[in-house]
């Protein structure tokens, strides 16, 4: 258990080993792609699949292990949907049962910077959504 300054205690902890992706809510996905792939020179990911209706959103690659997902949302919503941290392999059910996190979705298989993997969505103390994901060794 990890004590925090407000006197509460967090349960079992996970070991974060990297940053996987950030999900940006954008008004116009094509305009956002033009900006991130144009002046910033980032590599497009799954754009053809998205345009063909086979992927729910496109991404841009920041590094071999990090992407930014571009999701169309109305401007009244937050600009950041969630961010994803890579953690060491773990037993998801043990993490859920330990009660240290407010789980909002998962575990489930989802797309990330290195392909599909198991992940879990949790809330931080301020209500921000954090995705925790681990990749199999071959990813």
Residue ranges and their predicted role:
Residues 73, 77-81, 86:
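Helix-adjacent hinge/juxtasegments
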Residues 51-56, 77-79, 113-118:
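Short acidic/glycine-enriched loop/turn segments that link adjacent beta-strands
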Residues 2-30, 80-83, 138-139:
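N-terminal beta-strand motif that seeds the catalytic metal site of vicinal oxygen chelate
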Residues 68-71, 121, 131:
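Conserved beta-strand in the GNAT
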Residues 64-67, 76-77, 89-93:
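Short, charged/polar surface micro-motifs in flexible loops or helix N-caps
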